[in-house]
């Protein structure tokens, strides 16, 4: 007998053993087929969230499956240094002590960051272990460790030497609070209610006439270089080429024609400010205007405008109106609007809904800023230095396109190819510099004249310059730069290693759609460019894990579920503290608290890692977002318990008994049709689950396994086995015990990729009993292979007859309202010999006996069922009055519930305004109540006949 199922106990025991025994490491036998998988490195600042648990369940499931298929598997884990996120965390810690990074200086500050990383950096990898990830921890990397730093430098230098990295002035997303450029992924578009200001721009040769320009950003007016109109807009064609007076400045700017302008938007006249708007930048570039920068890096108005051409060359600047100099952009907006009003330039202000770009870390409004940055050229052709391959001579962007167009990289689901191509066809040069201290410092040095020397180290730079006293570039690289190299930086590049031969390309990348461009495309570019190979063969895109209402999980919204809390459980008070700390709007705390109490009135009970993993696997349908339902996790906790209890039953009936293994393996085994049926179902399940794993359909694998184990094995076969063990001869009992063990052991191996802990624990006991312990761990045992010869059609046909008979008897009991504890005799009238079936009925349907008769006995009360040509009748005395009273009371109760639910659904506006999932639940509840009522009414009618 097994002890009670205790997930925590078996999880810690087995994971430690797996890791200590080195089971996660590839054996580097290059004659074996390889399977490798790329882990999206989580931020070193981070803790495990539901998205991690979701994609790591899929990745680990694949790794365990292919390991059991005999592959040389490598799942290399690592963490990302997460430049901005990490620097912010440490700066906030220092701020709490009234210290800034500038007080410490760069070197001391970086020491603090490394100290923090050593203390906190292991949290997420320990949590990955809790989920059961069988990653090779001996190969764990950090994107700023020495090996990765060396690779980053080598890649940067080579790209620079190939003419693919340059420094120039470009428009970037600028976070004035952080004081750095940020990527598009770090910018959130927030819908806000703002204003649209309509401003008069008088004609220079006739100030009485003017065009009206509509803008949401009057504070950038000082940097205007033109007003654009649509060339097809007849209202303004006569003005194209004329000069306008720019309000508040006295400067004149031209009217230009550009198809970017929508005739029906605003007034049809758009101010063009190339240094402070991305769309205007493109318009300005087409018309070769100037770029006039009017803000400093803190987003305050400059005293003197900085002017450049589109080559980034400085031109003669000019003074800006003195009254605005030094004002923050929003203070400047207020002052300028007041001045426009006073001077008669402001026509009207209209309310306007707009999308405001905000930094996801600081919440500050992102400013398009013209700054000097380092870029990777996306469309330029390299000037040599590439490995021979089909990608040689192509630009980085063309390499990435070719990899997907040729089928070398496959997207699953395939529709993501369109998204990928859309991004690639509109690609811009990649801004890779960041004005931070934490990150890979750019390997470039400057002399006093501003000449730049890119080199692997300072000594090499000084050799290039022919002098000493060079100054190192202070900027660091975008975090995505080092992340883009992990497919080969983790396998020993630039050396030609066995790891590169065996594991590049990896088989699959499992990731969310939001980083297809930022990470996936860049890995394809860098890997094809430096190795001549694609980084991975398949890209499996999964959806986002949302809360039960379909909202994105966010700590700032208070709707996050911590996967570790699902594994270990957490009390209500601790859960409330967790969910109401760090809210974006602290005033929503009472609402969050109320919702939490409603959802988890007693906190979250312990589910165990296996139940969490099975839940995630069940959600893993291709590409769809997931609304996480806690009830489903509870259901899969019950499933694990069911497996445990089923194993207990099997052990009770097989331990120290003749099971047809070992010494009695040669003894005859008289298999019954249920034995042959369950073995046939096992082989069908092996086929289906193998197909599901190999096509990334973990949802189908989970569904198939659940149905087989719960319905076929536990609900049907175990119950039929009880009959065989009680009534069968020695040969029949031996066959049943043999089948019980054989099918259970194979099912445990089928389940192992999804639920590794419980399967390891049970397999260690079950496998030796059926001569199946071929390895020290289930994770090293071979995955089951289907044998179609064991699918016996006659056994399936016989099982269908038996299931129909049992279903008919159960329906009869239900129709007659016979309580579960009441036993009754069954009479079966049939010309066929049903002896093989009837022996199972008493135990399966709580009968005193099941008897085949030539004709059913006479009875006025007993209903008759027909099943496969046989007539069935239960003989039982019924107290009609008592049963009528009971059913009438039940009907009354059901009617009240129906009335209440119908009233709710017919309430005006409810079905349109209530959350869709609640409306669907109410409709499902209504259908269920109506079905119950119909059955009760049917029984009452029969009693009255």
UniProtKB/Swiss-Prot annotation:
UniProt xrefs under InterPro entries: aa-tRNA-synth_I_CS, aa-tRNA-synth_Ia, Anticodon_Ia_Val, M/V/L/I-tRNA-synth_anticd-bd, Rossmann-like_a/b/a_fold, tRNA-bd_arm, tRNAsynth_Ia_anticodon-bd, Val-tRNA_synth_C_sf
Principal location: cytoplasm
Keywords: Aminoacyl-tRNA synthetase, ATP-binding, Coiled coil, Cytoplasm, Ligase, Nucleotide-binding, Protein biosynthesis
Subcellular locations according to the entry: Cytoplasm
Coiled coil start-end: 879-945
Comment field on protein domains: ValRS has two distinct active sites: one for aminoacylation and one for editing. The misactivated threonine is translocated from the active site to the editing site. The C-terminal coiled-coil domain is crucial for aminoacylation activity.
Alphabetized HAMAP family for the sequence: Val_tRNA_synth_type1
Similarity comment: Belongs to the class-I aminoacyl-tRNA synthetase family. ValS type 1 subfamily.
Protein name (record): Valine--tRNA ligase
